[in-house]
Structure formats: C-alpha cells, structure tokens
C-alpha cells in the first residue's frame, strides 16, 4: 500500500507541474508510522534524489521515488503517512536538453495524452499499474467535511460583537 500511495502522489504531482509547464530537478520521498501508537516503535525517514535532467515525466518521477522508497522502507512497520515533494522547479520551455531525442518527444506526447484523458474522464482514468486500483490507503471520504473550504466564498463568516 505504501508503494501505491507514493506512486499516486508522484502521478498527481507530475500532472500538476506539467499543467504549469514546469520541470523538477529533485524529489524527496518521506514515510512515517504514527507517533501516537504507544505500543509500536515510531519510525520516520526521507530520501532526496536528484534527477540527471529536470523532468516532468511521470514514469521517471515514479521510478526515482520507488528507488528512494526502497532505500528507506523497513518491513514490519505500520506506516501511516507517505509523501513526496518535487523541488528545483523550473520552466520546462527553458530546460534545454541538448541530448533530446525522438523518444523524449514521444514521452511528452504520451504525458500530454494521459493528462488530456484524465482531465476529460476523471483523475486516474489512465494511470501506472503501481498506483493500484482499490486505494485502501486513501483518505476515507465519509470523514471529510461536506463544506468546500478551498473556496473562499464557502467559508463561514464570523462576526465579533
């Protein structure tokens, strides 16, 4: 499940930076167990990996993340949280790869097609197999607030008297 969550985080982050025409030079992967479980040992770790060339390719980002995850993952722990951070962001138009190939252009077209399909038919319509299908690890929607607090106009107004 931890592998699925890291993969899903990577796919979402890669899609977002492509939408902003950005590339990332570095990825940081983090995992942890619950600090509140008294019966279990707390474990937290992270790994930072630099890409040879800044990228927004989902496949490269997931591959690097899973390599990092394998280096910090310990068996027999109940992980509660995982995350990734893409950093060293730069404009993808300014990233000049002198070794750019036909393969790179095909990957760009593939990523664009995946983003288009997911935008049209819903997130994760097209995904990598490592992201899983059931996503048992995902946040339970029944525990989420029904109020959209991401929109400023839906926030409650409090008046002090």
Where are these regions (language model features)?
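Basic, low-complexity intrinsically disordered segments
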Residues: 1-161
């Amino acid at each position: 499940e931890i592998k699925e969550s890291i993969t899903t985080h990577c796919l979402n982050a890669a899609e977002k930076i492509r939408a902003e025409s950005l590339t990332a030079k570095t990825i940081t992967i983090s995992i942890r167990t619950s600090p509140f479980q008294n019966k279990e040992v707390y474990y937290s770790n992270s790994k930072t990996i630099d890409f040879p060339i800044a990228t927004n390719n989902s496949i490269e980002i997931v591959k690097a993340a899973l390599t990092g995850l394998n280096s910090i993952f310990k068996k027999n722990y109940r992980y509660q949280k995982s995350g990734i951070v893409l950093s060293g962001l730069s404009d993808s138009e300014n990233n000049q790869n002198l070794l750019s190939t036909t393969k790179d252009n095909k990957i760009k077209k593939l990523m664009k097609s995946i983003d288009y399909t997911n935008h049209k038919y819903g997130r994760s319509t097209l995904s990598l197999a490592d992201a899983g299908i059931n996503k048992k690890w995902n946040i339970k929607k029944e525990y989420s607030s029904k109020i959209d607090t991401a929109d400023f106009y839906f926030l409650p107004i409090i008046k002090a008297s």
